[in-house]
Amino acid sequence: MVLDPSRYQDHRTWKMTPGLIRARQPFFKKNMIGLAILAGVSAGIYTYTYSFLHKDNDFADVPIPPIDEKELEKLKKEYEQHKQERQ
């Protein structure tokens, strides 16, 4: 059977027996330190990558052309119409 009962688990509740808990105690602190290091390295890499990617500003030197007042009003009307259609 796939889930054969282990002698280190209670057969009714599947909880660890006191013997298994005692056997795992010496490794708990080292495992938590390893987990903290692994999580710290992962968070550091993620933070570095996120901050590096947000520094990118490729289009800073491209000038934005001025917009005509009539065209601006037309765009505002289109935006309002689109906003009302979504609701």
UniProtKB/Swiss-Prot annotation:
Residue intervals annotated with topology Mitochondrial intermembrane: 54-87
UniProt-annotated location(s): Mitochondrion inner membrane
Coiled-coil segments on the chain, per record: none
Transmembrane segments: 31-53
PANTHER family xref list: CYTOCHROME C OXIDASE ASSEMBLY FACTOR 3 HOMOLOG, MITOCHONDRIAL, CYTOCHROME C OXIDASE ASSEMBLY FACTOR 3, MITOCHONDRIAL
Protein function: Required for assembly of cytochrome c oxidase (complex IV).
Official protein name in the record: Cytochrome c oxidase assembly factor 3, mitochondrial
Organism: Zygosaccharomyces rouxii (strain ATCC 2623 / CBS 732 / NBRC 1130 / NCYC 568 / NRRL Y-229)
Lineage, top ranks: Eukaryota, Fungi, Dikarya, Ascomycota, Saccharomycotina
